Amino acid sequence: MIQIIKKLRVLLDKKQKRTMVGLIILMVISAFLQTAGVGMLVEVMQIVIDPEAVQHSRVAEACYEIMGVESYRTFSIIVMVLLILVFVVKNLFTYVQQKLTLSFVYTNQFRTSERMMRNYLRRGYEFYLNADTAVVQRSITSDVNNMYALILALLQLLSDSVVSLFVISYCFISSGTMTILMAVVLLLLMWLIKRVLKPIMYKAGKDNQDYYSSLFKWISQTVQGIKEVKISGKEQYFVSEYRKCGKGYVDAVQRYSLYNQVPKLLIETACVATMVGYMIFLVATGVPTENMLTVFGTLAAAALVLLPCVNRINNQINSTAYFEPFFMGVSDNLQDEINGQNIDMSFATDEDEKLDVKESIEMKDITYAYPNTERLIFDHADLKIPVGASVGIVGTSGAGKSTVVDILLGLLEPSTGHIYADSVDVKEPGNYRKWLKNIGYIPQMIFMLDDTIRKNVAFGVPEDKIDEDRLWEVLKEAQLDEFIKTLPEGLETGIGERGIRLSGGQRQRIGIARALYNDPEVLILDEATSALDNDTEAAIMESINRLHGRKTLIIIAHRLQTIEKCDIVYRVEDGRAKIERGNL
């Protein structure tokens, strides 16, 4: 618990912490009002049963004299009306306090989820080479939701603890012995419950986290591979694997729900047994009945508030243990940010200028090996690309063709060497975004939004900022404009998830149009046509070759016909990039 509070103090910003302090103050006021309501209820019950009891209560007698009423009966009626008003005010205040608490929790829950998404997006490309997509999805959604469930449990725990403390203090004034006895029994029982159930709840929370990720993973894999799943007739296998994870997830949730009910049953049993045992003791020792009625009337009224509070306190302690793994996951993911490391959390904007390149792009002295591997993909390699030239890069599978592109794009960080645009280091502060602004990238598998053709070409551009004329210009360059004009909905045609309603060639042409939309000087094709048939590839390359001389073209290819019109061809092998054809 202490560790959670320490991390929470660092995780929340100043505004959030100030809001929490305000909520705690409201909780204390609410606790006082609840205790006052219990106290008034006991006093009113005594006055209604015996109006003469006013004389035995200094507070009641003082109120009676101030009001100046004619009889105790009239006074009791007025007091009952006041009791109703007190409970109305108390409950209205509690409603407002709960509303503010829930508003704080759920508003900041989404903000933290957005913060997590930003945190993941600013991570380097190398992180995603080994990342589990299901874990990333869970971290941004489920982990954050459960983290705020923990914060809500902590706030409610504090609120109920303050109420319990106030009510116990009131009971102590009425019957010190009984209150101490009850408090000792409850504290021992709560300590025992916490000691036994906390490890069980923590394990259930960890299992929930792991199995929830697996459920995400199997759903994602099933949908992404639906064609192969159906052709191979393996539907049952995927359902079975999903069921296995589901069984573990259900078991974890069941354990949490079941063991969360145990404290309530134990506490109610212990409280009733303690009170009845104390009554037996009083009867056996000959305590007058009227004294017993006063004491137990007070305790019974207090129990209406205290028992639910104590039950909730135990549930909240168990919930804290259950949600702790989720909270720690969020905290760990935001650790760099929390530690105040120099991290740029902002993103590229339309205002960013392009890094102009007039003469050449160079990779100098590049050494690179993928994480957790020893084999060097590049060993002090050099590569030069003249501006305006069409440059092909070939090599065997695994030689490092696509790695060249990833290093040029700044996605991979070499252990030695630099990337220069006209002698300007593109990774120097302030240069990298400008460098990317001047590059159009066409991969083998075009990433498609489940949206319209318009949104896929003007990728990531807000609707109100899309340049309609530019859209049609690049579609014409990609030789896709005539096809779109034949569609009933034109640019507003939905392409389906992963562009399933389009052919492979049409998807690639959308990729070309997208790469050209921002009018970059450099166009990179990373095996962009290798998955297409020969005729479609020839048509796509015709569109690309029309840009020869107007753009600097960097073409990664398997097939020689793809690069037959390139001015320079590099072959990547043995950790180097060697010119196979053409001259610099």
PLM regions: where:
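ABC ATPase nucleotide-binding domain helical subdomain, centered on the C-loop/LSGGQ "ABC signature"
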Residues: Y420, L436, R454-E497, M541-E542, ...
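Hydrophobic alpha-helical segments in the permease module
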Residues: L83-K90, L187-L188, K264-I267, C271, ...
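Loop segments that connect adjacent transmembrane helices in multi-pass transporters
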Residues: L129-A134, D207-R255, Y322, F327-S331, ...
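Helix-to-loop junction immediately C-terminal to a conserved catalytic motif
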Residues: L409
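Transmembrane helices of ABC transporter permease
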Residues: L23-I29, Q156-D207, G277-M292
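Transmembrane helix-loop-helix hairpins at lipid-water interfaces of multipass membrane proteins
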Residues: V21-V89, F172-I180, V184, T289-L293
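Conserved signature/switch motifs of ABC ATPase nucleotide-binding domains
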Residues: N518, G549
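Cytosolic ends of transmembrane helices, especially the final helix of ABC transmembrane type-1 domains
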Residues: K230, K234, L258-Q261, V305-Q335
